[in-house]
Amino acid sequence: MVATGSLSSKNTASISELLDGGSHPGSLLSDFDYWDYVVPEPNLNEVVFEETTCQNLVKMLENCLSKSKQTKLGCSKVLVPEKLTQRIAQDVLRLSSTEPCGLRGCVMHVNLEIENVCKKLDRIVCDASVVPTFELTLVFKQESCSWTSLKDFFFSGGRFSSGLRRTLILSSGFRLVKKKLYSLIGTTVIEEC
């Protein structure tokens, strides 16, 4: 609901005349709508819900990385920059805020880019009871100056034998690609962070 104020049609005097003293000060206020002076209070339930949703999304991303480190990445440790998953979760919530079902309609594909090669890590369905309305593709990036390289793991058969002693260092940068599934135009939004 949007409340707007306007001068009543009964009063033909201009605002400048009213302000210059053409009438007494009380009449000016009575001509404007009450809602122009009321500031809406923040809904604390929404703020708490958004923070909880953000933290749940952070946990889902961290679980995805944890599961993938030995099964798909073949390493013993994944070092994640401080607040990276928090920033990603906030961006995901922002991108889902304009969708008909919000985050519930999201399917997220999580990938890792190493030396221009993308490795699929996981697929996260935010709410299986809702038909997806959009897809997000999250691309983590390996730290470019890191001393470890996992290129050998992707192209060799023995990734578990030698790889479990290695550490993967993630960059603080990431890419989010949003694709609307219900749009006839097929709108795609790419954000590089």
Curated annotation (Swiss-Prot):
First-listed, main subcellular location of the protein, grouped into a coarse class: cytoplasm
Tissue expression summary: Expressed in heart, skeletal muscle and testis.
One Gene Ontology term from the biological process aspect of the record: negative regulation of signal transduction
Organism ancestry: Eukaryota, Metazoa, Chordata, Craniata, Vertebrata
One Pfam match: RTP801_C
One GO cellular component term noted in the UniProt record for this chain: cytoplasm
Ranges in coiled-coil conformation: none
UniProt subcellular location: Cytoplasm
Record bears the keyword Cytoplasm: yes
Gene name linked to the record: Ddit4l
Induction text: Up-regulated in soleus muscle atrophied by disuse.
Descriptive protein name: DNA damage-inducible transcript 4-like protein
Keyword Cytoplasm among record annotations: yes
Role description: Inhibits cell growth by regulating the TOR signaling pathway upstream of the TSC1-TSC2 complex and downstream of AKT1.
Keyword vocabulary terms for this entry: Cytoplasm
